[in-house]
């Protein structure tokens, strides 16, 4: 029997019996009731026997457990007693250990005091012994100095230093220390001529010998100072020779003095880096410290000599750009040398070296804006010339705008090359004046066109399309100026962002740059100016915040030029309207009677209509497919040009709108209007309305209301005038002499 299934958690008696029965049938080949009964009897008997055995096993296990319980309880009690005894022993041992520690601690303290006293006694003994030999050492030192025995003096001085250290606890230590320092000074004075000579000759063997001597007497910094003094004296002489040599050359050659000197200095520095590494140890910064101390102390100073050259030069900006380039080239090679030699400069030396190279040039950076303004003003003044005709003036504006922005780009390039953009904000300030001077030229041409419009030569012509072409060209030129100004502003913002990043970069890391030499006040002022321009950029709508006044002036020029355009187109209309203008005074006062009009449109009105009908054919060549610049200019002048309709149609609508306004003004000047005159006037207005309908336009609301009021019968005037402007209702009623019934 497989009784293992009985212990499973999912045991099913029926399934278990059926499975065993199937196995029985397969083994015996019988499947009848008798076989089933026999199988069941056999399995029941086996199960009963199995259960009986299990019960016996359980009873036997229970009996054994009950029998062993007293023994387990006895053993547990014994174990508990043993644990209690162990705890008592551990407590007693802890007390014994504490007592031993207390006793040995006092003994150790006593031993330490004895050891300290022993050491002090030993030091005192040695001090007394050294004190006895101190006088002998002093005498031997004096003897060595008399014989100029440098090596002997050095050895005795080393021994004297050891003796001084040994006598540190004895009285009179300060006096002995002073004596040692005096001997060191005398030794340094004794060695100084030889030190200077060996450094001047570059004698490595002797220099190493002196390094050992000065290191032994703790005077290595003084030896390094001798090294720097020799180097600086040599290069000061080289500086004077360079200036004298260049002074005999031509002016272009004289400007190369700084390049020549820096090249020699770099070549020498490269050799000295290796020499000092062998002499003073790896990564010795002494050659770079020489440069940091040498350049500010040069006589005559670099800035004084450059100023002298600037006074005799007519190309000052080019000369400053040359010297700025020399500075940057020198520092570039110096940074490369630092990187190749793996020398890390201290923060202080890093700062001093940058100031030594660039600080003298900051006064020229401050002078740069004034020099740049002078040059730009001179260039712009050459452009400012009065032109004989408007056509010449407009062509001159196109050329001058192109040249102006070329000069401005060159000025920005000079600002970057000379000042590394440190004077960029000051350059922006002076550029406002340059732009204003250029915009004055636009104003002059506008006035010239306006005067040409009113002159007798042009007044005789009813249609002057040449002036219209000039105004369109000027609008296009203004738009070109605005587009280039916007791009120029964008370039300036990009440069200011780059400048801000360079100024905020930590100055004690990375290569040496001119930006680390800006003093705190100038740096703060520059960053504040850049932040102010960025703030204005975010707040501005028409510009990028750098030249808002220039944009405002430009907008005014756009409007003025567009007004001139309208005036050109309206001049024939005004001329025709002037011919039909009724008298201002009353007929009774003047004694003049109005003529008896026919009911056909007057000639002046028909001439206005014919002129308006011919306008599209004149405007379309100019505005049918305007350039992007002209389209932009027109959109600035009037928002209607932004609509998805041809610019010619927009301009025509503006002319018609102004024509209606002028016509209304003429009508409102009439004092009295008989019925026949009112009928004639209404016929004229209807004719004008029909003409405008052919153009796809209409008369304005005021003229339409006047037409309604003119056609209204006196008895229906009040009713038909409902919805019209009260001002027009009153004016027309008075003209027609209609008695108010209100």
From Swiss-Prot:
Required for normal Golgi function. It is found in: Golgi apparatus membrane. Pfam families: COG7 (PF10191). Component of the conserved oligomeric Golgi complex which is composed of eight different subunits and is required for normal Golgi morphology and localization. The lineage of its organism: Eukaryota, Metazoa, Ecdysozoa, Arthropoda, Hexapoda. One of its GO terms (biological process) is Golgi organization. GO terms for cellular component: acroblast; Golgi apparatus; Golgi membrane; Golgi transport complex. Keywords: Golgi apparatus, Membrane, Protein transport, Transport. Belongs to the COG7 family. It is a peripheral membrane protein. This is Conserved oligomeric Golgi complex subunit 7. Its main location: Golgi. The keyword Protein transport applies.
């Amino acid at each position: 029997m497989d009784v293992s299934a009985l212990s499973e958690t999912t045991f099913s008696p029926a399934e278990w019996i059926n499975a065993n029965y199937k196995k029985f049938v397969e083994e015996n080949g019988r499947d009848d009731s008798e076989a089933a009964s026999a199988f069941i009897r056999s399995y029941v008997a086996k199960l009963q026997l199995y259960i009986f055995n299990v019960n016996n096993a359980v009873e036997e296990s229970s009996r054994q457990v009950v029998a062993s319980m007293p023994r387990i309880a006895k053993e547990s009690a014994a174990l508990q007693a043993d644990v209690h005894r162990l705890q008592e022993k551990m407590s007693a041992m802890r007390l014994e250990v504490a007592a031993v520690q207390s006793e040995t601690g006092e003994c150790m303290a006593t031993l330490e005091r004895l050891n300290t006293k022993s050491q002090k006694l030993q030091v005192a003994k040695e001090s007394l012994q050294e004190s006895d030999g101190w006088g002998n050492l002093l005498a031997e030192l004096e003897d060595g100095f008399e014989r100029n025995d440098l090596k002997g003096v050095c050895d005795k001085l080393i021994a004297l230093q050891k003796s001084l250290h040994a006598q540190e606890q004895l009285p009179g230590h300060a006096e002995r220390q002073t004596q040692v320092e005096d001997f060191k000074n005398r030794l340094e004075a004794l060695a100084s001529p030889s030190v200077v000579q060996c450094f001047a000759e570059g004698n490595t063997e002797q220099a190493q010998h002196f390094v050992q001597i000065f290191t032994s007497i703790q005077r290595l910094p003084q030896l390094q100072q001798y090294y720097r003094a020799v180097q600086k004296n040599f290069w000061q002489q080289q500086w004077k020779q360079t200036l004298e040599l260049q002074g005999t050359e031509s002016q272009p050659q004289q400007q190369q003095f700084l390049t020549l000197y820096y090249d020699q200095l770099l070549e020498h520095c490269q050799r000295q880096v290796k020499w000092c590494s062998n002499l003073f140890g790896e990564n010795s910064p002494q050659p770079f410290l020489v440069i940091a101390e040498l350049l500010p102390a040069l006589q005559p100073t670099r800035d004084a000599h450059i100023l002298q050259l600037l006074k005799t030069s007519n190309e000052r900006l080019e000369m400053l750009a040359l010297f700025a380039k020399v500075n940057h080239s020198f520092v570039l090679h110096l940074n490369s040398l630092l990187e190749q030699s793996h020398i890390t400069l201290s923060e202080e030396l890093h700062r001093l070296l940058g100031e030594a190279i660039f600080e003298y040039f900051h006064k020229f950076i401050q002078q740069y804006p004034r020099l740049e303004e002078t040059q730009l003003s001179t260039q712009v003044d050459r452009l400012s010339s009065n032109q004989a005709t408007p056509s010449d003036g407009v062509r001159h504006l196109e050329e001058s705008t192109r040249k102006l922005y070329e000069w401005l780009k060159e000025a920005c390039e000079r600002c970057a090359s000379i000042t590394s953009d440190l004077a960029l904000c000051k350059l922006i300030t002076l550029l406002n004046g340059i732009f204003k001077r250029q915009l004055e030229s636009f104003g002059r041409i506008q006035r010239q066109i306006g005067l040409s419009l009113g002159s007798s030569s042009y007044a005789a012509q009813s249609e002057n399309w040449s002036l219209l072409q000039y105004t369109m060209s000027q609008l296009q030129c203004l738009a070109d100026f605005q587009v280039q100004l916007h791009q120029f502003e964008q370039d300036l913002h990009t440069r200011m962002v780059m400048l801000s990043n360079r100024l905020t970069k930590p100055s004690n890391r990375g290569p040496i740059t001119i930006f680390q030499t800006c003093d705190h006040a100038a740096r703060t002022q520059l960053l504040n100016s850049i932040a102010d321009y960025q703030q204005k950029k975010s707040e501005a709508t028409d510009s990028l915040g750098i030249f808002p006044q220039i944009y405002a002036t430009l907008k005014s020029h756009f409007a003025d030029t567009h007004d001139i355009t309208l005036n050109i187109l309206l001049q024939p209309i005004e001329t025709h309207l002037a011919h039909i203008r009724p008298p201002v005074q009353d007929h009774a006062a003047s004694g003049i009677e109005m003529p008896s009009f026919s009911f056909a449109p007057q000639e002046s009105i028909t001439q206005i209509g014919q002129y308006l009908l011919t306008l599209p054919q004149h405007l379309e060549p100019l505005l049918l497919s305007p350039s992007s610049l002209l389209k932009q200019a027109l959109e600035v002048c009037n928002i209607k040009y932004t609509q998805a309709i041809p610019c010619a149609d927009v301009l025509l609508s503006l002319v018609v709108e102004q024509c209606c306004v002028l016509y209304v003004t003429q009508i409102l000047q009439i004092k009295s209007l008989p019925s026949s005159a009112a009928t004639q006037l209404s016929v004229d207005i209807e004719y004008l309305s029909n003409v405008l309908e052919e153009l796809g336009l209409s008369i304005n609301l005021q003229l339409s209301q006047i037409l309604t009021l003119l056609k209204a019968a006196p008895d229906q005037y009040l009713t038909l005038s409902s919805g019209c402007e009260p001002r027009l209702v009153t004016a027309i009623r008075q003209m027609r002499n209609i008695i108010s019934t209100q």
